[in-house]
A protein has these predicted regions:
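Beta1-alpha1 glycine-rich phosphate/pyrophosphate-binding loop at the start
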Residues: 3-30, 38-42, 55, 66-80, ...
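Residue-level detector of alpha-helix initiation sites
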Residues: 95, 159-160, 184, 297-301, ...
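C-terminal structured "cap/appendage" subdomains that terminate the fold
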Residues: 405-407, 411-413, 417-464, 479
């Protein structure tokens, strides 16, 4: 018996050359050709007990795919070169694989059984190739709903949770209207993730499909200002709040209101709007500037890549955690994500452009240095992380480590506040199982659980749709009983 995982090395999506791609906003990666992707799927075929599709939490850690993608099944079909059935199987659990195949951090790969001793199966690359190939072949077509129930559902927010809920409810026959405060549909998929990572044409293509299937979209509607939840509840049979985690965290240090301090989402949104033909405000333009990105996550990396494309003189990224190791640490056993050091697309670009990795670790920002009202630098200290025997970590300041970094533009990418205060502004309180304290009003996605992964947002959208459908069915039963 031939063990393909031993004879076939892991391979991921082909990428454009760094020196080429930093001069435009086109996607940096593309799908695999049939031959290589079949080989990658074959690496999955010797698995005895798959965990990649489990989709659960251990503490706050995601184990496997939260939407329970049938990964071993579509890998088998790809290995047999049956791409159409692989596409069908993929769509059984995932409304938007063209999104997850581009921007999901792939917890499935961290829980891949092969990853215990070898490089895991390139699941994310296979997923993207399946769906991109399906679009190329013309297999992805509008699914027309045969019969309408007569119920009307309003969904506030058009991110992955809202769109997934809309898709599910529409296919169940309910009439769905999605309300979005921005001028484009997609939420953070559209304005929070840069084009080189997720082309906006990919987002529009899916929105066009959903619209062709009967979903109605309204942009420029700010619920809470233009219309209240109470008013919507009077107009619709059910309302879903899928407004996401909206309030970005700020630095909270002296000088953080200076000119030149910008929040990451505002910066990335302005960049995408420029691609759509809008003028770029000078405060969101990194050209010729020394840029510091505070925050070591994916959004921070996207800011690094965007600043490079704008022509930044230099880019430095502050992270509060230590540098990761090259191999899985003992305290992160399988099936947890290995959380190892990797050179993301943005860091490869920074190394290619500036001949240096932009990442610095264990940095605490203490004060913004200003001249007049404008930022010119950041005073910092280096930290040391000590892990106690009980597993809890403590950070200490390294004596004598003070350093001032010059900066013309500081991008703050340290996440979002909890969503509960934003919900209260809309007049509702979130309760368990997607319901709120207002009858017929539901909540899902980051608006319910706080900032999370795209796959959790899709799962929440699918699950809240089940809750709403059951609620509407109960309303119908009560109506029949009363009559």
């Amino acid at each position: 018996m031939r063990h393909n995982f031993l004879s076939i090395p892991r391979e991921t999506l082909p990428e454009r050359g760094v020196k080429d791609r930093i001069h435009d906003y086109g996607e940096y990666a593309s799908r695999m050709e049939d031959g290589p992707i079949v080989k990658q799927a074959e690496r999955c075929m010797d698995c005895g007990t798959p965990f990649c599709h489990v989709g659960d939490l251990i503490g706050q850690e995601t184990i496997g795919c939260p939407i329970h993608n049938l990964i071993p099944e579509w890998n088998r079909l790809v290995s047999d070169q049956d791409f159409f059935r692989a596409y069908e199987r993929l769509m059984e659990t995932n409304n938007f694989p063209e999104f997850t195949g581009r921007v999901c951090p792939a917890p499935c790969e961290g829980s891949c059984t092969l990853g215990i001793s070898e490089d895991p199966v390139a699941i994310k690359s296979i997923e993207r190739t399946i769906i991109d190939r399906a679009f190329e072949q013309g297999w992805v077509k509008p699914r027309h709903v045969r019969q309408r129930t007569g119920y009307r559902v309003a969904i506030i927010g058009s991110g992955p949770a809202g769109l997934a809920a809309a898709d599910q409810l529409n296919q169940l026959g309910h009439t769905v209207t999605v309300l979005e405060k921005a001028d484009e549909i997609g939420g953070l998929l559209y304005y929070g993730i840069p084009n080189m990572k997720l082309d906006k044409g990919v987002v529009r293509r899916r929105v066009d499909l959903l619209e062709a299937e009967g979903i109605r979209f309204k942009t420029g509607v700010n619920v809470g200002e233009d219309v209240t939840v109470e008013a919507l509840r009077g107009e619709y049979d059910a309302v879903i709040l899928a407004t996401g985690a909206q309030k970005q965290r700020t630095l909270g240090i002296d000088g953080d209101d200076a000119s030149g301090i910008e929040l990451a989402m505002d910066y990335l949104t302005a960049s995408t709007k420029q691609l759509n033909g809008k003028d770029l405000d000078s405060r969101h333009d990194a050209e010729g500037k020394h840029v510091i990105v505070i925050g070591g996550g994916d959004t921070g990396a996207d800011c690094v890549a965007t600043a490079i494309r704008q022509g930044a003189a230099s880019v430095t990224q502050f992270g509060k955690h230590p540098e990761k190791g090259l191999y899985r640490a003992p305290e992160r056993p399988w099936p947890l994500q290995p959380d190892t050091l990797s050179t993301d697309y943005a860091y490869a670009e920074a190394i290619g452009q500036y001949e240096a990795d932009p990442r610095t670790y264990l940095i605490r920002s203490n004060q913004i240095v200003t001249e007049g009202d404008k930022v010119v630098g950041i005073e910092t200290e280096r930290m040391e992380k000590i892990v106690k025997p009980d597993g809890h970590a403590t950070f200490f300041v390294v004596e004598g480590s003070e350093k001032t970094y010059p900066a013309d533009l500081v991008l703050v990418a340290i996440g979002f506040e909890r969503p509960e205060p934003e919900l209260r502004k809309l007049g509702v309180e979130s309760k368990r199982d997607y319901v709120t304290d207002v009858d017929g009003v539901f909540v899902a996605g980051d608006a319910r659980r706080g900032q999370s992964l795209i796959v959790w947002a899709i799962r929440e959208g699918r699950e809240v749709a089940e809750k709403v459908d059951a609620y509407l069915e109960t309303c119908q039963t009560e109506l029949k009983t009363s009559s």
